[in-house]
Amino acid sequence: MKKIPNKLLAVSAFLTITTTYAVIPIETFAIEIQQTNTENRSLSANEEQMKKALQDAGLFVKAMNEYSYLLIHNPDVSFEGITINGNTDLPSKIVQDQKNARAHAVTWNTHVKKQLLDTLTGIIEYDTKFENHYETLVEAINTGNGDTLKKGITDLQG
């Protein structure tokens, strides 16, 4: 049976607790849009799923920010000179793993986080754009106005 390192267990427990109890407001990623019509209907069949996905993404970003901060700002833990159940190469592997984790945390902070937030922003902007064009598209379909429909779809694409 393979033993799981205590540090891995501690980090996993920390991330689980952080993501379970840390709540980031959904308003950070999505602004609620109120409809002016009096009907109680949803424009998006997956509106609740979208809200849940955005909320989960917000929790993920928060957890990754905290984790990367800890990795970058905490010193290396060294077990050099300690024999760990016959695993003589384990201390050097731990040091290398810490260096790799720190490099990944820097990559998260400098590249990945921005790409993720840009993607989430793009999704929200498209959703808003779609909601703004929805009534016009439905009306164009119902009246058979092909030109308006083409223009609306073209606007959504660009």
Swiss-Prot record:
- Segments forming a coiled coil: none
Name the Gene3D superfamilies on file.
Answer: 1.20.1170.10
Keyword terms, alphabetized = Cell membrane, Membrane, Signal, Transmembrane, Transmembrane helix
InterPro entries named among the record's database cross-references: Enterotoxin_cmpnt, HBL
Any one GO cellular component localisation term in the record: plasma membrane
Q: Give the intrachain disulfide bonds.
A: none
Q: What is this protein called?
A: Uncharacterized protein in hblA 3'region
The organism's taxonomy opens as:
Bacteria, Bacillati, Bacillota, Bacilli, Bacillales
